[in-house]
Amino acid sequence: MANILHIDSSPRGDRSISRKLSYEFITSWKDTHPGDTVTYRDLGHNPVPHVDEPWIAAAFSSPESHTPELKTAIELSDTLIDEFLAADRLVFGVPMYNLNIPSTFKAYIDQIVRAGKTFTVDANGYKGLVDSSKKVLIITSRGGSYPPGTPYAAYDYQEPYLRAILGFMGLTDVTFIHAESLNMGEDAREKSLAGAKDAIAQAVANW
């Protein structure tokens, strides 16, 4: 029995492709793994705050020294980190905005990437503290296409960043399913969506 953390980051509702696809995966997964539990967070409709000065002061000082203001500033981060660490598997629905991730998802990442919690640093450099056995599935939606080996690959700041920041915390078992070319004509859109749905079915069977 596994605990899955499912996060959507699109502010769009029923029109969101990443939401529809992440929901399709979770629904199919629950059908075939009825004993698993799913914790859901909707960052698109319920965003977490960006880090601010009190947050930074709290993150880089001992809890024993925290004033009531600092305790309040870091409380949500502690909750999000506990939730993140408690999950055996992570499923993220992430649209591409301006070649990267939505600011809602970046704010979430900034809340959970914390020294002493999800990474540490010593004389040898940085080391992730998150259990590397956790699996991550990231389902994206993209208007364009950024195939490796083409000039357009340089525009993809979404997948490389997510692989880097997850790896920074210790997570290396990361799978991407891209629904792309969504703004490149109906034929390209339908072909890509069909491919993404096939990949989701494969992930349900093999992930």
UniProtKB/Swiss-Prot annotation:
Keywords: Flavoprotein, FMN, NAD, Oxidoreductase. Binds 1 FMN per subunit. It catalyses: 2 a quinone + NADH + H(+) = 2 a 1,4-benzosemiquinone + NAD(+); N,N-dimethyl-1,4-phenylenediamine + anthranilate + 2 NAD(+) = 2-(4-dimethylaminophenyl)diazenylbenzoate + 2 NADH + 2 H(+). InterPro entries: Flavodoxin_fold, Flavoprotein-like_sf, FMN-dep_NADH:Q_OxRdtase_AzoR1, NADH:quinone_OxRdtase_FMN_depd. Its cofactor is FMN. The keyword NAD applies. It is an enzyme of class 1 (oxidoreductase). FMN binds at residues 10, 16-18, 96-99, 141-144. The keyword NAD applies. Its EC number is 1.6.5.-, 1.7.1.17. GO terms for molecular function: electron transfer activity; FMN binding; oxidoreductase activity, acting on NAD(P)H as acceptor; oxidoreductase activity, acting on NAD(P)H, quinone or similar compound as acceptor. Quinone reductase that provides resistance to thiol-specific stress caused by electrophilic quinones. Belongs to the azoreductase type 1 family. Homodimer. This is FMN-dependent NADH:quinone oxidoreductase. It comes from Nostoc sp. (strain PCC 7120 / SAG 25.82 / UTEX 2576). The gene is azoR.
